[in-house]
Amino acid sequence: MSAVNVAPELINADNTITYDAIVIGAGVIGPCVATGLARKGKKVLIVERDWAMPDRIVGELMQPGGVRALRSLGMIQSINNIEAYPVTGYTVFFNGEQVDIPYPYKADIPKVEKLKDLVKDGNDKVLEDSTIHIKDYEDDERERGVAFVHGRFLNNLRNITAQEPNVTRVQGNCIEILKDEKNEVVGAKVDIDGRGKVEFKAHLTFICDGIFSRFRKELHPDHVPTVGSSFVGMSLFNAKNPAPMHGHVILGSDHMPILVYQISPEETRILCAYNSPKVPADIKSWMIKDVQPFIPKSLRPSFDEAVSQGKFRAMPNSYLPARQNDVTGMCVIGDALNMRHPLTGGGMTVGLHDVVLLIKKIGDLDFSDREKVLDELLDYHFERKSYDSVINVLSVALYSLFAADSDNLKALQKGCFKYFQRGGDCVNKPVEFLSGVLPKPLQLTRVFFAVAFYTIYLNMEERGFLGLPMALLEGIMILITAIRVFTPFLFGELIG
């Protein structure tokens, strides 16, 4: 976009002052950081390469934990007037069977925390619009998530940020993180179209440049994600979803996981897992051969139409444990800091929770006291572990089970589904983890291994008395597999 098409306020930011904070990136997390700090009285500069509405297939389903975080930040109305679609739970399909998993009761979890100076004038309540209804979100006995067209949601977040008098916006490409002679971060250099390379100074610089972060390595050269699989996405139009207002997880012994969720009254997103960082060379043929046979009948017409049009979108599935923010004058946050498998839709929830905790920890500090801020950021790293570890480990563990590529993993996949079918706490506890409202890693460990032992029990029952010796051997292998799938990631998240 040339300078003549950019609003003057996006290129004329003052570079003669020292800002309290510079925020690099205006994805989901950047505007929330900027808005929260501005409402705390901080002078904030937020830099974004392109303020036009993006077209992406990431960040389209927000779990209840993310919705609650938006309430805490006083930014929940960002889901309004974009034809966002309510989400009330999940339906899991496995080899033709299905089980419904509704979101938790509000009475079973703590009330939403309202952050001082951020929540005011009812900005923690949704508004009434064509798809989001006050009575559903405010009065329903259960928590709700929400799905939406990502770009529309992002535009709303950015508009909220733009209304803050303490926020200055810049359209430009951040090309360098500035450091002083002590190697402490003091700002950023931005290439602004029509203005050139401009240096901006700040007491604290936030790196929020997302999945493909250019600057996460400022924390450490080895802070890079691993990519083990990918999703191929399509838009289904006017689809007849088997379980309206539910996310759909379609599993089977002979295929990779398939996710389906509605993002507007007309559009439904389908994401098909592929167990390689590189997508198939002939995506259309792969869709017809390896995915189409397992699509529920009601979805087949819209699925077939989407395949025939061939508008496929691919996204990598990355994993990146968080590192300590131990560089004075800098804070890396969001996907730039920490990523997990997108199977469970927990990315925005983790990022928004991080913003809530961040504002609580440093929002009232004087950012010119850089050592004090650094101390709080080090504490913040450990305080965030309780919730980020649950969502991150759950995402990786469930993907391992749902994309089972060995007999032991397939046994655990079947056992997990049968565990859900028991209902009661066998559904209630897992969905609290999935929703991002139960930040208790030890409880997650207990539930995961309850699934493992239930799988062993089912296998013994299936083998019968004569097959008991074989069942015992298989049980040992199933348990070893469960340990290998779960514990390294939990250890890495909690200890790292």
UniProtKB/Swiss-Prot annotation:
Catalytic activity: squalene + reduced [NADPH--hemoprotein reductase] + O2 = (S)-2,3-epoxysqualene + oxidized [NADPH--hemoprotein reductase] + H2O + H(+)
Membrane topology according to the record: Multi-pass membrane protein
Topology Cytoplasmic: residue spans: 1-16, 496
Protein name as annotated: Squalene epoxidase ERG1
Site keyed Important for enzyme activity: positions: 90
Subcellular compartments: Microsome membrane; Endoplasmic reticulum membrane; Lipid droplet
Activity regulation, short description: Inhibited by the allylamine antimycotic drugs.
One MF term in the entry's GO annotations: squalene monooxygenase activity
Segments on the Lumenal face: 38-474
The enzyme's E.C. designation: 1.14.14.17
Keywords noted in UniProt: Endoplasmic reticulum, FAD, Flavoprotein, Isopeptide bond, Lipid biosynthesis, Lipid droplet, Lipid metabolism, Membrane, Microsome, Oxidoreductase, Steroid biosynthesis, Steroid metabolism, Sterol biosynthesis, Sterol metabolism, Transmembrane, Transmembrane helix, Ubl conjugation
Gene Ontology CC: endoplasmic reticulum; endoplasmic reticulum membrane; lipid droplet
UniProt xrefs under PANTHER family: SQUALENE MONOOXYGENASE
Cofactor: FAD
Mitochondrion in keyword set: no
Miscellaneous remark of the record: Present with 65400 molecules/cell in log phase SD medium.
pH effects: Optimum pH is 7.5.
BP GO annotations: ergosterol biosynthetic process
InterPro entries linked to this entry: FAD/NAD-bd_sf (IPR036188), Squalene_epoxidase (IPR013698), Squalene_monox (IPR040125)
Organism, as annotated: Saccharomyces cerevisiae (strain ATCC 204508 / S288c)
Gene of this entry: ERG1
Glycyl lysine isopeptide (Lys-Gly) (interchain with G-Cter in ubiquitin) cross-link, renumbered residues: 284, 289, 311
